[in-house]
């Protein structure tokens, strides 16, 4: 295939437009080189932010778009190949489209120049960020999380190289304003080979300032809500429980920061919700409370409020965790509370959450809606709890994933 192929008349194409239409999701092939020089290949989940809602590219036959990154520096390379192209000046150029979302350092077509540029950057390479916490092991490898310094040229350049993954793997994802100093960017590396570490994924989080009262304001005591906006683990590292380790290590770091009073998540996907629930449940039950000690009379007391604040959990997430613990108790015969009591307790929260809508319904319909909502939630809780051994202080049981966000993660 070649991008210097013959140009075909638009009239011929109008007879068979399907031959000249490519799925941009299929055409775009992403490669990331491994530490041994091999390239791992995968396709994006989304391309509509770049190529439009239809996720189609018209005017080319046998279109293949190669978007390649080095595992260590994430130096980008782009090439576009096709067997034939229509003679139509209005056609969108996929090369120009993609280059508008990539940093200026991106090399087009010249693979030798790309390899030389990577090798030059790797000379005396240092991760452009500050280590968060400690280096940790997972299996036979070592990993570290680094907070990028966006005022540093290398840190900013790495951010620009990574950010296109937000568009390709997070639904409704968008670029963050890197000039806004309230953004934090954390990159997870495999550092088994310290000279050439491999990027595993990254997370962005926004720091919302919270007014804590005049006394704290006068004494310059800052309080922030840390909002996770974007969370990506590269596809070849998903399913290895590295996403859970990434999230847990970030949470440990924020737990130790007295300025952070709450950790929240912006518009999570179902897969990230699952990861978060399992991580939060495991951390709560391993380090803080005994599962069997959670009782209905305790949940609406000062004990629960204090626990939530200590764990820096938002109210909705904390309520969900307690409800899951109650369901877990029933499943493992760890409580004297009846299933009916738990059901009524959860239904009460569901009613209060949707009170305005439910009050407009007649009683039979309202009760039916509540029962349907409860049954769906109970089923989802049991799915999340499946495989967790909370009362046995089990090890972390989470999976890697990506999180959706808007506007961005």
From Swiss-Prot:
GO CC aspect terms: chromosome, telomeric region; cytoplasm; histone acetyltransferase complex; nucleus
Swiss-Prot/TrEMBL catalytic activity: L-lysyl-[protein] + acetyl-CoA = N(6)-acetyl-L-lysyl-[protein] + CoA + H(+)
Keyword terms, alphabetized: Acyltransferase, Chromatin regulator, Cytoplasm, DNA damage, DNA repair, Nucleus, Transferase
GO molecular function, one term: chromatin binding
Taxonomy, superkingdom: Eukaryota
EC number(s) on file: 2.3.1.48
SUPFAM superfamilies: Acyl-CoA N-acyltransferases (Nat)
Region annotation Interaction with histone H4 N-terminus: where it falls in the sequence: 53-55, 206-208
Residues binding acetyl-CoA, per UniProt: 231-233, 238-244
Site (Interaction with histone H4 N-terminus): 183
Record's function text: Catalytic component of the histone acetylase B (HAT-B) complex. Acetylates 'Lys-12' of histone H4 which is required for telomeric silencing. Has intrinsic substrate specificity that modifies lysine in recognition sequence GXGKXG. Involved in DNA double-strand break repair.
Family under the similarity heading: Belongs to the HAT1 family.
Name of the protein: Histone acetyltransferase type B catalytic subunit
Organism: Debaryomyces hansenii (strain ATCC 36239 / CBS 767 / BCRC 21394 / JCM 1990 / NBRC 0083 / IGC 2968) (Yeast)
